[in-house]
């Protein structure tokens, strides 16, 4: 039975310059681990499309995995001078380094789940990040055009505490479990999907990842099953810390999160060993 581990990194996770404190450092190390252990990286949108079509080889073979990034800060795409920890090699450039390290090249694709609202991103960047304009959407089309990236939805505004004043309808913020009725789901999911398809159309625009990895029964059992065709979303991802299988719930697909589900090269090796059983 095919099993696809989906590994998740956050470009904004830079609290130092070692594996435990920096997702960029962790990704570079993890790519070497993946290669050493004989795993291959497959594009997530293509794997999901094959899975939904009933292709028995949807995972792309044995010992395959997919890579995702969350939030879509510019640390995903651009090398940036972190104010405390120096220049950071972007997540996608780290993938490019891995691809180009061998003369024949190696497959290395990732899907970045982005916060779609520009107003929200600019506000949170200003008051909660570095206030340097490092949460933009100017690179999304370039990422898609590279052939090594997909851009997918991480909701309209992440239902983020710092963006509460920009939200039109009251709800509890800092959690996605509060998105539990149609109007709120339309604001967070349908609006984001429609806008992303306009500004950066690509195979990833049919995928959604829940902010905070949080689902609820309304979204999983009612909203997505009834509205997915209309809003153009084919699958949704949580953070269930197990490999995706053919029997997985289409609206709560699992992912592993760096720093939570593994914290070292040895931890990733153990995770992959368990995932392949």
Q: How would you describe each model-predicted region?
A:
Residues 4, 151-164:
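Short, solvent-exposed beta-strand-terminating loops
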Residues 11-148, 159, 197-198, 204, ...:
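Active-site beta->alpha N-cap acidic-glycine motif
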Residues 18-19, 122-125, 162-164, 218-222, ...:
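A short acidic (Asp/Glu
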Residues 46-48, 155, 176-179, 199-207, ...:
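His/Asp/Glu-enriched short active-site or ligand-binding loop at hydrolase and phosphoryl-transfer sites
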Residues 164-179:
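A solvent-exposed, charged loop/short amphipathic helix patch at secondary-structure junctions
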């Amino acid at each position: 039975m095919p099993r696809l581990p989906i590994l998740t990194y956050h470009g904004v996770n830079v609290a130092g310059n070692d594996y435990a404190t920096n997702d960029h450092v962790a990704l570079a190390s993890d790519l070497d681990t993946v290669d050493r252990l004989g795993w291959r990286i497959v594009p997530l949108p293509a794997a999901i499309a094959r899975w939904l079509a009933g292709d028995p080889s949807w995972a792309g073979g044995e010992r395959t995995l997919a890579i995702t990034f969350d939030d879509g800060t510019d640390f995903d795409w651009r090398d940036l001078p972190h104010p405390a920890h120096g220049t950071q090699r972007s997540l996608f450039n780290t993938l490019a380094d891995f691809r180009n390290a061998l003369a024949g090249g190696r497959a290395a694709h990732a899907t970045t789940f982005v916060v779609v609202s520009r107003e929200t991103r600019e506000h949170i960047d200003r008051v909660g990040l570095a206030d340097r304009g490092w949460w933009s959407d100017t690179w999304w089309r370039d990422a898609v055009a590279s052939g090594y990236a997909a851009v997918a939805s991480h909701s309209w505004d992440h239902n983020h505490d710092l963006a509460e004043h920009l939200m039109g309808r009251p709800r509890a913020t800092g959690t996605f479990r509060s998105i539990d009725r149609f109007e709120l789901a339309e604001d967070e999911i349908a609006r984001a999907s429609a806008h992303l398809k306009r500004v950066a159309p690509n195979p990833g625009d049919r995928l959604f990842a829940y902010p905070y990895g949080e689902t609820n029964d309304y979204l999983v059992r009612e909203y997505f099953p009834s509205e997915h065709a209309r809003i153009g979303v084919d699958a949704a991802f949580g953070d269930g810390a197990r490999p995706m299988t053919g029997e997985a719930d289409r609206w709560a697909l699992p992912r592993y999160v760096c720093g939570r589900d593994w914290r070292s090269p040895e931890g990733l090796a153990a995770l992959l060993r368990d995932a392949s059983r």
